A protein has these predicted regions:
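Accessory beta-strand-rich segments of carbohydrate-active enzymes
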Residues: 83-86, 116-193
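Bacterial N-terminal signal peptides that target proteins for export
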Residues: 13-22
Length: 193
């Protein structure tokens, strides 16, 4: 009969095709996710020291930069950060894909940073997440930088908290108003040299 549709049954062949498409899609998604999951690894530089061989990326210069005044509650954010090359004056986006890892506080030109890259375009985005300890909640939280060469624009959870220009001087921002009540906080820093 013309104009009539076949019964709403799905053949075994159609089910097999759907399963195959789902399997391929999952493999592709896994591959994309794995490609974005970059691990930090120290590069081999022209002059490596014994100190660099024993460096613990989970505890980099743990006592530095320590606030000048003694405080019980503070966090050291040295360690592995996400990194991506930026274009000059690029606006922040939560959708950025960070394709490298860098060991902070080392400059990206150094082997120990894990990047060892020189570029005419010295604009980068640094990113990491952190969780504010219970003991610090409800208090003003200051984010200190020992130095950023040359310009830094700092975002916390997508909100711009400040801009600093000048390569060799310490600075800080009060980030309290940009923090979420609970959970992970995102810290993103645009750096232009």
């Amino acid at each position: 009969m013309r104009g009539e549709h076949a019964p709403a049954s799905i053949s075994k062949m159609t089910i097999m095709k759907i399963k195959h498409m789902i399997a391929v899609s999952l493999l592709l998604l896994t591959g994309i996710r794995t490609a974005n999951a970059v691990e930090w690894q120290m590069k081999q530089g022209p002059m490596m020291t014994p100190w660099s061989e024993t460096l613990d990326p989970e505890n980099v210069l743990g006592e530095y930069p320590r606030p000048q005044m003694e405080r019980q509650e503070w966090m050291n954010l040295n360690g592995i950060w996400d990194l991506r090359k930026a274009i000059q004056d690029e606006a922040y986006s939560p959708d950025f894909i960070y394709d490298k890892k860098i060991l902070v506080p080392f400059p990206l030109e150094s082997a120990i940073s894990g990047v060892m890259e020189e570029s005419d375009n010295q604009c980068y985005w640094y990113r990491r997440t952190l969780t504010i300890p219970e003991s610090m909640k409800g208090k003003n939280i200051l984010l200190h930088f020992d130095a950023v060469d040359w310009e830094a624009i700092v975002y916390v959870n997508g909100k711009k908290v400040g801009k600093h220009t000048g390569g060799y001087d310490p600075f800080y921002f009060d980030i309290t108003s940009a923090l979420k009540q609970d959970g992970e906080q995102e810290l993103a820093v645009y750096v232009r040299d």
